């Protein structure tokens, strides 16, 4: 609709539950990335559990889309050297964000969609230069509605919407922290 694409950092357990939705999103040109399997606090896991979080998500994505993710966003942004090494062992580049809309706070608020819209616009414009990564969750109705409103306004202002991989290529980076 806005001639753009996005990156969806998906939980492996959700990819297993809803493979048709994941495949549909992927086939429409969006990027599917890893958010690990169950949204665990990764630095608190032992090496075996950490490996399972990553491996099971890679497998779930391959099963749904026919391809494995190359990007990962650790739940809560929580990471340490062990987590980073585990990601790298799977060839995953770790991605964080520039702006957190905190959309989960407004999931049940009457004017939540407008608040989320305002936060998306604020975060999209927060840094000078080209390209920001804005954290939004696709599981809340107010987030989806707020995103639609923000995309409408930002597209009228000339903003473009690209996948994280495309942004990284443009900026000449392999990761975004």
Language model region names:
Residues 1-6, 130-177:
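Terminal accessory/targeting
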Residues 22, 32, 79-81, 143, ...:
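A broad, structure-centric signal for solvent-exposed, well-ordered loop/edge residues
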Residues 9-13, 36-37, 73-78, 97-100, ...:
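Active-site-proximal beta-strand/loop segments in catalytic clefts of secreted hydrolases
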Residues 22, 32, 116, 133-134, ...:
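Hydrophobic aliphatic residue packing
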Residues 1-69, 149, 153, 160, ...:
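Active-site beta->alpha N-cap acidic-glycine motif
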Residues 27, 40-67, 78-130, 143-146:
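Alpha-helical scaffold elements lining the catalytic groove of polysaccharide deacetylases
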Residues 18-19, 42-47, 68-71, 107-109, ...:
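Low-complexity, flexible helical/coil segments
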């Amino acid at each position: 609709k806005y001639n753009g694409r996005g990156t969806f950092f998906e939980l492996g357990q959700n990819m297993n539950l809803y493979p048709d939705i994941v495949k549909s999103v992927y086939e429409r040109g969006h990027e599917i990335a890893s958010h690990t399997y169950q949204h665990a606090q990764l630095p608190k896991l032992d090496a075996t559990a950490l490996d399972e979080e990553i491996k099971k998500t890679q497998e779930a994505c391959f099963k749904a889309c026919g391809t494995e993710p190359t990007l990962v966003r650790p739940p809560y942004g929580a990471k340490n050297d062990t987590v980073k090494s585990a990601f790298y062992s799977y060839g995953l580049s770790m991605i964080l964000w520039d702006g957190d809309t905190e959309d989960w706070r407004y999931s049940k608020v009457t004017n939540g969609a407008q608040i989320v819209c305002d936060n998306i616009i604020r975060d999209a414009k927060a840094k000078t230069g080209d390209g920001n990564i804005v954290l939004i969750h696709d599981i809340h109705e107010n987030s989806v509605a707020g995103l639609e409103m923000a995309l409408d306004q930002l597209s009228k202002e000339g903003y473009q919407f690209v996948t994280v991989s495309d942004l990284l290529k443009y900026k000449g980076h392999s990761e975004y922290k």
